[in-house]
Amino acid sequence: MSEHETAGEGRFNSIEVRVLGSLIEKQATSPESYPLTLNALVLACNQKTSREPVMNLTQGQVGQALRVLEGQGMTRLQMGSRADRWEHRVDKALELVPAQLVLMGLMFLRGPQTLNELLTRSNRLHDFDDTEQIQHQLERLISRGLALHLPRQAGQREDRYTHALGDPAEIEAILAARQQEGGGRSGGSVSEERIEALEARIAALEARLAELEG
């Protein structure tokens, strides 16, 4: 799939994910300049810090992503006398509480992360007391098919969590990489079970999004 194509109904490609994550972050960290102009959003998407991977998007790419997301009810354009500005609608579209919105934003921007990483990286965005609070909110997201739990593999000390709204091919690539990482320690049947469980969560997500769009 090309970067310029939509990831399918209810799914977002890598550019759309970066756009949503950047809007969520800037709403919390730069409220004085939010909603964002297109130029400010491009700069936010291409930041060298707090982004994994670092991207180099053009105004055309970001503008196209915004139009696709607007059609899905995820962003909204605010017309202004000086400049048009964009805001996200993720919390309203997906019915998220503030804590869940922050976690989704972090996972949009940096992919799979541990509970401790999410706690550290959320300190400017939301006041979580500890990793237990984060895990509770993640479990609620997982139950709705919006996030995935990735059990730790060989050489890793902690489990990781990521959002489940990306391109299915990208999710499958993550799963395949983790299967290879864990191949030396766990048998193929365990990896297959994990993949089947994650595929079930993806199916649940598709059903949930179909409900929202209906």
From Swiss-Prot:
Protein name according to UniProt: UPF0502 protein Pput_3252
Protein source organism: Pseudomonas putida (strain ATCC 700007 / DSM 6899 / JCM 31910 / BCRC 17059 / LMG 24140 / F1)
Biological classification of the source: Bacteria, Pseudomonadati, Pseudomonadota, Gammaproteobacteria, Pseudomonadales
Pfam families: DUF480
Protein family per UniProt: Belongs to the UPF0502 family.
